[in-house]
Amino acid sequence: MRIILITGISGSGKSVALNVLEDAGYYCVDNLPAQFIPELTRYLDAQGYTHLGVATDIRSRESLDQLPDTVRALAAEHQVEVIFLTASTDALVQRYSETRRRHPLSARTDGAAGGGAFNDTALMEAIEMERSLLSPLAEAAHRIDTSNVRTNTLRSWIKELIRDDSQRLTLLFESFGFKHGVPSDADMVFDVRSLPNPYYDLALRPLTGRDTPVIDFLQGQPMVLAMAEDIRAYVEKWLPSFIADNRSYLTVAIGCTGGQHRSVYIAERLANYFRAHGNVLVRHRELAPAG
């Protein structure tokens, strides 16, 4: 059975991710404590189900400590992947402000009977408390930062991640702009800001690293080709180590100043090379479609 566990910070898009799994034919359960996941898996396996999606988060905080052991036990018999959704505190505060929903940790105090007593924990404090409590889970999961991501874009990303379950590891190349921040979900980060910048050519400025004139410009620069080759060699050298570690995903982030030209070109070039090695995805954060 393929089991995908969705966890992460409240307000970061877990419901969206679980809905994508459900639309893809997964048997989905929201807010299931970790200790019940093995029992549910055994039952569904006996019934002939092949795909299970489970969301578990701070609402089941008493059992979260059991999740790593649960994942290891399930992985002995099933294909298990953990996706951890996160977002910046500013983005989360904005979302809570728009929806007017209460954060789980601001709604009650630990150990309160009858559903808990309301307290005065500020929203930002609740978010940071949750981030601290969940940090051990994030370390062992595939992280997705949804801070600047629209709902439709997140849906597309999740669809891509679950599209092909025949590969042991999905390799994701992500371009980004340093002026918008480094992706928190990256496993490797490469800085290509020292390369010649098409931005300073007025004819190339409105284009992207996927457009032929920009590609021709960058491919004509020996420095660009040399750096792309060095990054390729590094990733290829260490990729077997990540596969041996039973990783489901590896995110390689390529950053330039604005995330429009150089990083996009390098990410596309690397993806084209590594597609021969298995399941490869490309994400251009700053070129994400509207909607």
From Swiss-Prot:
Displays ATPase and GTPase activities. InterPro entries: P-loop_NTPase, RapZ-like, RapZ-like_N, RapZ_C. GTP binds at residues 57-60. The lineage of its organism: Bacteria, Pseudomonadati, Pseudomonadota, Betaproteobacteria, Burkholderiales. ATP binds at residues 8-15. Belongs to the RapZ-like family. It holds the Pfam family RapZ-like_N. Keywords: ATP-binding, GTP-binding, Nucleotide-binding. GO terms for molecular function: ATP binding; GTP binding. It comes from the Bacteria. This is Nucleotide-binding protein RALTA_A0325.
